[in-house]
């Protein structure tokens, strides 16, 4: 294969320079036609440099070689006899053979997977999200190689796999074949027996029958007016199900097979949708979840899609049956597909596009966040402006409730003087609430009676308060054509956030500021 026919992947960044020092890069380009693996040539060049030893060391080495020749009657292995593989890929402008390429991919993967491990001796429980695509399949293959090593190279990992069945929303073309293939691939090929198939309908709970939940889920997505909102809601539901399964299996770490291309698309799409505040966290190797103790890891962040496909092809893994009936969507289908098409065009023009974006986002630092304030739908932290808006709404609601209470108390007092509903007379038929004493009527006005001041507020049950959502999710919630029967976890998160914010608003006058503590210490 000539150098022009080799697939080109990525850019010439510092990763390959860390593997092959810069001072030997001139040696790599010397061969005519560049039809040999660069790393193999580097190994040869490195051996040549090692032979430039002192006279004593050269004599000792010759004596050892002569002894070996006399004992084994074999010719010594020289530098020219070492095999040099044929290049199969231009890995970031460097030509590598399959063995060197496989070794480099595994090395880069281990550097990221080490960040997941907290203990080198105890087996780490990992939950791997298996979608059935190329990236997740390669992720499992690399994890298998990490667990099959010997000695120090072996990692002790307790791997459990989960597949979110989205056939109710995005129908699979060969649903049964896909599920059977995933089970066979996971159990037989890789040897991971723990595979769970979780339907997407479980996001609505498990109390109602599956058919009823399927209809509710379809109706919920049908009410969304834009395809972008449908894709985002599907992503949030999928992540929430992964968190629930992780809690169920007692796994605190979820491993995703997200490639660098997908993260670059997510970076541009999230910024265009107003989610720039959470971009540094969502595109890093470790995704923090402020609302719970589950963390998401993306160890394949450094690999391009083309690099993953070439690795996947050389492993001779059976292809997954076509899962979706529509694979090639139009670029203007949604914001996500539009950003994906835009970045693919830039990547074809310049190989530096994806890695430049990811290196740029690595330099971004999110401001300090309050872990108590998270979006009810996507669980991303709210900005300081959104928190202030939420506190303002709660303060206005409290003021309105106080005004209503005062007005109701005045009306009740007037009605009591006029023998109204809660009359103070001792006749049994003149009082609808059976109040016969002034004290009893005044006390019951503070409770939930027929003339209670809180009756109007208790009956108005708000399912999801828009102020508990981030900017992007507010747009998503606005896209619903009618009030949706949304997932229970969203209502629960919204209610909890409102309660927390209201409690903080009530006790804020009794809290001590840090400035006051400093003044006390100075005195």
UniProtKB/Swiss-Prot annotation:
Biased composition (Basic and acidic residues): 57-67
Keywords, sorted A to Z: Cytoplasm, tRNA processing
Protein location: Cytoplasm
Region feature (Disordered): 53-81
Function: Plays a central role in 2-thiolation of mcm(5)S(2)U at tRNA wobble positions of tRNA(Lys), tRNA(Glu) and tRNA(Gln). May act by forming a heterodimer with ctu1/atpbd3 that ligates sulfur from thiocarboxylated urm1 onto the uridine of tRNAs at wobble position.
Organism: Dictyostelium discoideum (Social amoeba)
InterPro entries in UniProt: CTU2, Rossmann-like_a/b/a_fold
Gene3D superfamilies to which the protein is assigned, alphabetical: HUPs (3.40.50.620)
Protein name (Swiss-Prot/TrEMBL): Cytoplasmic tRNA 2-thiolation protein 2
């Amino acid at each position: 294969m000539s150098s022009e026919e080799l697939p080109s992947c990525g850019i010439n960044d510092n990763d390959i320079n860390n593997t092959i020092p810069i001072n030997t890069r001139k040696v790599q380009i010397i061969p005519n036609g560049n039809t040999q693996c660069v790393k193999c040539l580097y190994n040869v060049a490195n051996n040549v440099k090692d032979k430039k030893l002192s006279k004593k060391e050269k004599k000792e080495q010759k004596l050892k070689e002569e002894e070996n020749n006399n004992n084994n009657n074999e010719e010594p292995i020289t530098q020219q006899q070492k095999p040099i593989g044929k290049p199969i890929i231009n890995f970031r402008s460097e030509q590598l053979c399959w063995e060197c390429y496989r070794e480099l991919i595994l090395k880069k993967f281990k550097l990221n997977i080490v960040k997941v491990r907290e203990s080198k001796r105890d087996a780490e429980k990992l939950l791997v999200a298996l979608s059935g695509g190329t990236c997740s399949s390669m992720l499992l293959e690399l994890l298998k190689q990490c667990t099959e090593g010997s000695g120090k190279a072996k990692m002790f990992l307790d791997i459990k796999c989960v597949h979110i069945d989205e056939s109710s929303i995005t129908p699979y073309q060969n649903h049964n074949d896909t599920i059977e293939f995933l089970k066979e691939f996971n159990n037989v090929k890789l040897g991971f027996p723990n595979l769970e198939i979780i339907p997407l309908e479980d996001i609505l709970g498990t109390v109602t029958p599956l058919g009823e939940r399927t209809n509710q889920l379809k109706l919920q997505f049908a009410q969304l007016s834009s395809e972008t909102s449908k894709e985002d809601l599907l992503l949030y539901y999928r992540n929430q199900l992964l968190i629930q399964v992780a809690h169920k299996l007692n796994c605190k770490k979820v491993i995703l097979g997200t490639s660098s291309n997908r993260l670059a698309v997510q970076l541009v799409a999230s910024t265009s949708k107003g989610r720039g505040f959470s971009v540094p966290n969502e595109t890093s190797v470790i995704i923090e979840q402020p609302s719970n103790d589950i963390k998401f890891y993306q160890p394949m962040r450094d690999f391009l899609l083309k690099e993953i496909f070439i690795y996947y092809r050389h492993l001779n893994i059976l292809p997954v049956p076509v899962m979706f009936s529509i694979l090639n969507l139009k670029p203007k289908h949604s914001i996500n597909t539009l950003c994906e098409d835009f970045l693919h065009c830039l990547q074809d023009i310049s190989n530096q596009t994806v890695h430049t974006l990811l290196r740029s986002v690595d330099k971004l630092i999110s401001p300090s966040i309050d872990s108590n304030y998270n979006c009810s739908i996507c669980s991303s932290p709210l900005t300081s402006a959104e928190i202030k808006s939420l506190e303002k709404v709660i303060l206005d609601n409290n003021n309105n409730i106080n005004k209503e209470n005062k007005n109701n108390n005045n009306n009740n007092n007037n009605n009591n003087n006029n023998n109204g509903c809660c009359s103070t007379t001792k006749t049994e038929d003149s009082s609808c609430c059976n109040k016969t004493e002034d004290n009893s009527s005044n006390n019951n006005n503070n409770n939930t009676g027929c003339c209670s001041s809180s009756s109007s507020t208790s009956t108005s049950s708000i399912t999801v308060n828009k102020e508990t959502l981030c900017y992007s999710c507010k747009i998503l919630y606005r896209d619903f054509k009618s009030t949706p029967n949304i997932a229970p976890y969203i209502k629960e998160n919204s209610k909890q956030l409102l309660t927390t914010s209201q409690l903080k608003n009530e006790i804020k006058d009794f809290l001590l500021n840090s400035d006051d503590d400093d003044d006390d210490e100075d005195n």
